[in-house]
Amino acid sequence: MEATIRDKAERGIKTYLERQGFEIMEEGWAHGSDRIDFIADDEGELAFIDCRVNDNDGHGFADDKVDREAFERLAAAYLTEHGEIPDSRVRFDVVSMLILSEGTGLLRHHRNALSVGD
């Protein structure tokens, strides 16, 4: 089965995160109808990471707006299910990729995306 553009973009985002020192703990984790692309440890912080992929259609990067309630539901469910995780800060990141051409894209990492415009 051939990988889609989104699949390739998510692999690229995962590589970026790992190079930045993130330890990927989960990929495509879901609870009910809520889903998050990655859950990772970033120097002791638990990061819930949503990926946004957009073709270069003249509109630029995908919207960085996040669904606070969905993020919080996911975090609560994950922490409840994984009680062995030590106390740590939790944050919500958005990583956006703008596809420019086959194999080329721009990446933007918005750390702690819920802290802006709350």
Identify the function of each model-found stretch.
Residues R19-L46:
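Active-site metal-binding core of divalent-cation-utilizing nuclease and nuclease-like domains
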Residues F38-G58, F71:
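Conserved catalytic cores of phosphodiester-cleaving nucleases, focusing on short active-site segments
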Residues M25-E26, E81-G83:
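Short helix-to-loop capping/linker segments positioned immediately adjacent to catalytic or ligand/cofactor-binding
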Residues H82-D118:
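Domain-level recognition of nuclease-like catalytic cores that cleave nucleotide substrates
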Residues D55-A77:
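Mg2+/Mn2+-dependent nuclease catalytic core
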Residues W29, C51-V53, N112:
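Active-site donor-binding loop signature of nucleotide-sugar glycosyltransferases
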Residues E10, D37, D50, D93:
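Acidic active-site catalytic centers that drive phospho-/nucleotidyl reactions
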Residues M1-G28:
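Acidic-basic catalytic patches of nuclease active cores, encompassing PD-(D/E)XK
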